[in-house]
Each structure stands twice: as structure tokens, then as C-alpha cells.
């Protein structure tokens, strides 16, 4: 199978790799460049565990044709923390017990980051809508919604993080 | 079978490539096609992509608006001229789906998807293929022969310019809140006073979105009151054979269609 060269920015760092024709971005992130933070859930666009930001917009990496990120900027949870310091969203998730098994958490965090970047003071309804494409099957949604609202209240969740 | 991906900068080149490709499929936003690839769909041999800006344009053409086939649901929601379609785009998936899902892709979406196309059908939209200037195919005709249209590239969808956002009403009926696949969607365009000239379309009541022709006839000249719409509700599923699938049975769909149609026509909360 022919491979194609692709260059993009991942959490602020330049990446150059080869992708297979038809390969999805999630596969390239995890196996190609070693970023294991986006999770493989359903590969159908149903669960949201693989949500990443492409040029600031939320996208399902499992449904993104990898070669379409050529020249674009991709952000994952790996770019949220800054050294030992967690991102305010991550802090809020921790304080609100918004993760149990944690598998949905990377997708929830990136969906929340996308929301807060364009709407730093969302209402509860807007938070629910923002994570409406992300499924959680153990914690339940209330703690997650509370965490996102708390992070929004801190006022610093939108701009932090790399990429 | 390995898949081959071709990217073209010009829509004419993409159209030629698609028509000559063996087992070719056009790539819109990827929400349906990538899913098929992830599931190793062996029927796909070639994927044709197109980066021509014409696919991303929204422009006025007289009293109609041409929406490029590559315009996403998120872009529909952000476009003031398309405010009447924003509530329909908003109910499609979560934000990450809406960043990718396109108007053109939705035209080909099989049940339980294709809610946006249901609204387009109610709006008397028409489809313009690549290379066609000035002419277009009524969406109803397009849908009747949809399976055979896969070999052609859709350039844009033409819709009427609607200034009263209440003229287009839409409901997506799901069992899962806040988002889930529709067991039925209903769109009603009410361009005149009362039911005059109304167009009603159902999604997931047939293999493609379909008009509720009998209900439309019953509404002609009627007022949008409980009494005025009574005959239309009786005729809500006349001439249709709703499917039985994992979301609902034919019986259930027949039972609830008039209930949701009534709420829609009377403007009652869904």
C-alpha cells in the first residue's frame, strides 16, 4: 500500500510522518507519532473518546482522514499539561471526581477546551451540548458538567495548553 | 483491499476522476465514509477528494441560496443567511461531528442519518452537480434515484431564501437524549398563511427522506389549528410504508407520526 508524507503541528511541535491511504488520524497519532492520549473507542464517531482539536475545532480523529491534517494544527490532551502543572480543566476534573475509568476523559477534556476557547462563560445547557457527542459509561455526566463549569468559572481554562 | 485516495484541486477534475474510478466514492466530511473504511468496507476502491473552494461557498442566486456541498454543519450554524437552517444543523451529532459533516454528504446518508436532507426536501431544495451551470435537479428526483448518483460530484444545494425562521419547522424524534439517532424526523415548510403551499417531509420513514403528500394536500387552505390540521393528521402516513428497524417498528412509527406532526404544526414544544 502506498504511503504518503504528512506534516502537521501536534501540540505546538512539528511532526512529519508517513500515512497509509485511507488511514485515520487516530491511528496515526497513536501508532505513527506515539501520542496515546486520544483513545480508540468505537471507530464509528459515536463515543467521542478520540476527540482532538484541529485548528481549534473539535474533530473525531477516528473519522478524520489522516492526510487531511497536512499543514494544520492538531491538539490533544498531551498538550494540556505544562510540566508538572495540570491544565485548569484537568484540575477541575480531579476536584469534581469527573473521571472513574478515565477512558472518556481525553475526549471530554478536548470537547470542553473547544467550548471554552470560543465561549469562556458557558451556561450549563451549552456545556451539555458541547459534550453531547461524548459518551461516559461510569462516572455519569453530572460530575463532568460540574467540572467544566468550575473550570470556566476560574477564567483561565480556555487559553492554557499547547497547540 | 487497499483503498486509493486521490485529491483534486479542481471540481471538474474530481468529477472526471470519480466517474472513471472503479468502486469510487466521493469524500465529503468523512463522518460516514471513514466509518465505512474503519469497518473495512470492501466495496470502496477509490476515494476522491476535492479541495476546490467552490465547494465551501455560500452565495446568493436571486431568491435562492447556493450552499456548497462541502459546507459543514458548523458553518451552517455560523452563517447568518442560513439562520433558518441552524436549528436543523444543531441537532446533528455533537460539535465534533458538525465540524466535519457536510451538506453534500448528508444527501447520501442512509437511515438513521440524513436529517438535514429531510429539511432540504421540505424546502424544495435542488441539487447542482459539478459542471452544471444554471441548472439543477429537484431534490425529490435526486433522492428517487440516489443510489445511481454516487458516481457524480455534487457542487451545491439550492434552497429558497427564508427570512422568517418560523417558516421552517423541524423535529428529530429520538429515544436517547440529548443526542441520538432519529427514529423519525419531520420538517415542515409553511411559506404562506396557514397551511397554504406547505411542504412536509419525513426522515427515516422510508429508505430516503420522503414527502408526506397526503398530509400536505389535507393542509392546503386549512388553518393551523387543532380543527384545521385534523384531516392532515389522519393522513400523516398515508401512502407510506415505514420500516421496522432497531429504532422502532412500523406500527410505532405510524402511531407517533401524527403526534409529532401535530406538535410541529401547532408550534407546541417537543
Where in the sequence are the language-model features?
Chain B
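C-terminal structural segment of proteins
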Residues: 1-270
